[in-house]
Structures are given as C-alpha cells and as structure tokens.
C-alpha cells in the first residue's frame, strides 16, 4: 500500500500521511457478511468506564472474518480485495465452489483471481491453510490457532508474520511477531504468508481530529490532575509526582511492573518471552 504525505497547507496537514488505496480496493461490503456493532464507548452494562480514552468515532459496520478456515478441501477464488474500517489490513472476499462466500484476511501478494484452499494436503502457497505438522521449517505464517479448532488468534495484525523454527514430538516452536518464542500443537491450523499492509506503522496521524475519528479520546497526564483524581496530582504549579515510583490512577505500581498472572497454564509453553519483558 502506498502512503501519501501532505504538504504543510495547514497545521493539520503538516507531517500528516494517509493510505492511498489502489483501484482494485473496494469498500462496499457484502450485506450477509456484515452486522452493525454498537459502540460501547469503553463502558460496561452499568455505564461505568472500564476502558478509558474511548468514545465517539465514525460509525462502522463489522465484517465477519473467517478465522476458522473450516471449509475443508473446497477451493475458493479471491473475488475482491476490500477495505475494512475495523482493522489496518485489507480483507478478501472469497467465492467457494459450493456457492458460499466468506471474508479472509488479505495475505501479502495475493491477487484477485487467485485460488485458496484449507486442507491437510494443501500446497505450500500464499493464502492456503493447513496444520503446522504439514508445513516445512522456516515457513512464514499468520492467523495461527492456539487451540485446535478454535480459530486463528495469533499474528493477525497488519504486516504480522510468524515463523516455524523447530518441531519436536507433538509441538512446533514458533517465533511470533512480538519476538516471543512459543510452543504450539502441530494440529493447529495456520495460513501461509504475511498479513498485508506491512506499512501500517509508517503512517503519521498528524492531527488530533484523526484520532477522534478512530474513537480515541485524549489522554490526560496524572501530574496535571487534582490529588483526588490521581496519585500524581496536586502541588503548586508544575510539580513532580511526589512519589518514589510512578503509580496508576488506582494506586498500583506502573512502568515496569509485570501484569501477567502467575501460574498461568501457558507458562510451560513459552520458551522465551517477548522483547519488552
């Protein structure tokens, strides 16, 4: 995908960049594969804020993505490549031989008219889904299952790719996009290739309004709040936080404390934690 940069006509366009969609990318979705999603604005069923800095944004229609890839041994043809407002990558509308239509994530390099299939004996080509046991070492994959039959949960973001680096017994060793090395059952399904739009991180938002269109509200620093609102608040003028270590708004240690639960079932499956830990 091409990233187009604006000239500094106004303060909002200075250093701002947007994605320039190609002619093959369409945005009108299939009605039967969509449903309206209520914007909860970060509130729970009682109206209490459970996730801060969310609200507003443009209305979206959710596209049902086939993360399961459970159409076994039935070939499909890529009919369209479409824009999805709910994710940074594109999605592909696939026409299967039995007449069913489904959306899948857009693999890098996939073109309109290409065929895909989900099978244990599928060829090693971009867009095909098959178990890890039938993939050679070094294969680039995405949309990886953690539990067999549950659907892909790993490496689904724009530009994400995981690699098979070893196999032993019933488990395969994968290097995930975060740098984490993890063991996964070889019965799990994965899709070959890299997720499209690998330049998503190179876009510059440029102005506050673009963030509001995405449904993201401003983040206020705790040091400029009142003491009743944040442990860092208060003081005369510009003052330090007045603590030995930074705290969250609820008084818990921040910036460096590990938040992963102890004695989690997957601890024995993680060979090496991701880079930022």
From Swiss-Prot:
Gene3D superfamilies from the UniProt entry: 2.30.30.30, Nucleic acid-binding proteins, Ribosomal protein L2, domain 3
Pfam families per the UniProt record, alphabetical: Ribosomal_L2, Ribosomal_L2_C
Region (Disordered): 224-257
Superkingdom of this protein's organism: Eukaryota
Localisation: Plastid, Chloroplast
Gene Ontology molecular functions: rRNA binding; structural constituent of ribosome; transferase activity
Keyword Chloroplast: yes
Biological processes annotated in GO: mitochondrial translation
Keywords: Chloroplast, Plastid, Ribonucleoprotein, Ribosomal protein
GO-annotated cellular components: chloroplast; mitochondrial large ribosomal subunit
Broad class of where this protein is predominantly found: plastid
Protein family membership: Belongs to the universal ribosomal protein uL2 family.
Subunit comment: Part of the 50S ribosomal subunit.
HAMAP family: Ribosomal_uL2_B
Protein name: Large ribosomal subunit protein uL2c
Organism: Anthoceros angustus (Hornwort)
Gene name of this polypeptide: rpl2
């Amino acid at each position: 995908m091409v990233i187009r940069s604006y000239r500094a006509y106004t303060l909002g366009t200075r250093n701002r960049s947007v994605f320039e969609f190609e002619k093959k990318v369409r945005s009108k979705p299939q009605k039967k594969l969509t449903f309206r999603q209520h914007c909860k604005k970060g509130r729970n069923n009682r109206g209490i804020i459970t996730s801060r800095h969310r609200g507003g944004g443009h209305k979206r229609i959710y596209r049902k993505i086939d993360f399961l890839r459970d159409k076994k041994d039935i070939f499909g043809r890529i009919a369209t490549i479409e824009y999805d407002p709910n994710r940074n990558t594109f999605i592909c509308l696939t026409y299967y031989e039995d007449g069913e239509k489904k959306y899948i994530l857009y693999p890098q390099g996939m073109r309109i008219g290409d065929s895909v299939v989900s099978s244990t004996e599928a060829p090693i080509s971009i867009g095909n889904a098959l178990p890890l046991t039938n993939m050679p070492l070094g294969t680039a994959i995405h949309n990886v299952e953690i539990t067999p039959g549950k659907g892909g949960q790993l490496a689904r973001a724009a530009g994400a790719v995981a690699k098979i680096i070893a196999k032993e017994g019933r488990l395969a060793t994968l290097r995930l996009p975060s740098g984490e090395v993890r063991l996964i059952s070889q019965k799990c399904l994965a899709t070959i290739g890299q997720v499209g739009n690998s330049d998503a991180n190179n876009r510059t938002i440029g102005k506050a309004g673009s963030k509001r269109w995405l449904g993201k509200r401003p983040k206020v620093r705790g040091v400029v709040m009142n003491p009743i609102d944040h442990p860092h608040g208060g003081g005369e003028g510009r003052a330090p936080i007045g603590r030995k270590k930074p705290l969250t708004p609820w008084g818990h240690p921040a910036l460096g404390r590990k938040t992963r639960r102890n004695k989690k079932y997957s601890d024995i499956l993680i060979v090496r934690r991701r880079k930022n830990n």
